Amino acid sequence: MLKYQLKNENGWMHRRLVRRKSDMERGEIWLVSLDPTAGHEQQGTRPVLIVTPAAFNRVTRLPVVVPVTSGGNFARTAGFAVSLDGVGIRTTGVVRCDQPRTIDMKARGGKRLERVPETIMNEVLGRLSTILT
């Protein structure tokens, strides 16, 4: 967030928070190129879900993301996937919680698409917690 002050016609100071185009928040889906990759990593230009909080992303400019795919059969059967179908957003497929990675969104030409519902974000964080702890 970018802070700035404004004076109104009476000379009063007001602070406003303005969201910068590059701000990245937990729960947002961005379209980004994941190439180059190696092995079984998700590749190509695809949606990713940001899982790190905005404060972390502002400081590091390197969010941790998980890819969204229309495939992911292994992740589905192993319980690592969270479905986005029928949750009221345009992006469809499954979130691959088994493939978190840190990316430089700016260098990869990332573009903000939309935000997932809080229930989906909580489910993704729960799956990540199970995998990482």
UniProtKB/Swiss-Prot annotation:
Q: Is Hydrolase found in the keyword set?
A: yes
Give EC number(s), comma-separated.
3.1.-.-
Q: Which GO terms describe its molecular function?
A: DNA binding; RNA binding; RNA endonuclease activity
Please provide the record's keywords in A-Z order: DNA-binding, Endonuclease, Hydrolase, Nuclease, Plasmid, RNA-binding, Toxin-antitoxin system
Q: Mind telling me which InterPro entries this protein's record contains?
A: PemK-like (IPR003477), Plasmid_toxin/cell-grow_inhib (IPR011067)
- EC top class, as a word: hydrolase
* Pfam families tied to this protein: PemK_toxin
Kindly list the biological process annotations in GO that this record carries: mRNA catabolic process; rRNA catabolic process
For this chain, the family text in UniProt reads: Belongs to the PemK/MazF family.
Function recorded in the entry:
Toxic component of a type II toxin-antitoxin (TA) system. Probably functions as an endoribonuclease. Responsible for the stable maintenance of the plasmid during cell division by postsegregational killing of plasmid-less daughter cells. Neutralized by coexpression with cognate antitoxin PemI. Both PemI and PemK proteins bind to the promoter region of the pem operon to autoregulate their synthesis.
**The protein's assembly and partners:** Homodimer.
This protein is called Endoribonuclease PemK
